Design a protein with these regions (language model features):
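A short SAM/SAH-binding and catalytic strip from SAM-dependent methyltransferases
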Residues: 130-142
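Conserved Class I S-adenosyl-L-methionine
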Residues: 196-253
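Conserved alpha-helix/loop element of class I SAM-dependent methyltransferases that forms part
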Residues: 41-59
Length: 253
């Protein structure tokens, strides 16, 4: 299966911002999540706090959000940690939305967003103290190239934190290739060290719960954002038991 295109994601992001159904999904599935986050991913406030700790950020540092989408999780992290934020996404619609939404988090002066690819961010070498990627790395045309790009933009000892999935059974052929990634092997191959993979049941429970809540809301009528999530849920719920949600951490040399 080929990687989704920027045009595919433009359509998705256009639907998200106006979707009352998606807002309702998050109210029911993750009531602890601040409403302004409006994620295009499977995060709770507890998971974002875990990511913030793993990034080991200090106020005044720079965080790169790779595959930032509409910006919510990265903007939350910037607000909570006092860092500057640069978000990168290949969807111009997402970048426009993220730029606009920075004001909701009170970080307009410290956040900027640029159109770029996970494998070619156009950021300078050693630009960021840390990098985060929320449910995005597996969409790269080449996850290995994305890992190499993340290392390039990180300063020495910079932290990389990803949220994603891994198979319960390594190499499970029932799953698409992007859900079978061996994260430690991938990141070590890009030169990272101190690679860790953590899974907690509540992270995977949230993933499945978002899909079930979306389906239970019933007929989306003219809500294209909810309709898209329901279609995705029907495709992915049958394979949910084959994967686990993980937070992957690594350190640049």
């Amino acid at each position: 299966m080929s990687a989704p295109s920027a045009t595919d994601f433009d359509q998705d992001f256009s639907a998200v911002g106006t979707s009352a159904g998606l807002r309702r999904v998050w109210e029911l599935a993750a009531p602890d999540l601040p409403p302004e986050v409006q994620p295009f991913s499977f995060v709770s406030a507890a998971l974002l706090r875990h990511v913030a700790r793993a990034l080991r950020l200090s106020p005044g540092q720079t965080l790169a959000d790779l595959g930032c989408g509409r910006g919510g999780p990265g903007l939350w992290l910037a607000r909570e940690t006092g860092v500057s934020l640069v978000g990168v996404d290949f969807s111009p619609v997402a970048i426009d939305e993220a730029t606009r939404r920075a004001a909701l988090f009170g970080v307009t002066a410290k956040a900027r967003f640029v159109v770029g690819d996970l494998t070619d961010t156009a950021l300078p070498d050693a630009h960021a103290d840390a990098a985060v990627s929320i449910d995005a790395f597996h969409f790269a045309a080449s996850p290995a190239a994305a890992a190499a790009e993340a290392r390039r933009i990180l300063r020495p000892a910079g932290r990389l934190v990803l949220t994603n999935w891994q198979p319960e059974v390594p190499g499970d052929a029932r799953l698409p290739a992007r859900l079978r990634i061996d994260w430690p092997r991938l990141l070590r191959g890009a030169g990272f060290g101190d690679v860790g993979v953590e899974a907690q049941p509540e992270w995977h429970d949230l993933y499945a719960r978002v899909y079930r809540v979306a389906i239970d809301l019933g007929d989306p009528r003219d809500d294209s954002g909810l309709a898209r999530l329901q279609d995705e849920a029907r495709r992915r719920l049958p394979e949910a038991g084959l994967t686990r949600r993980v937070v992957v951490t690594a350190t640049a040399p």
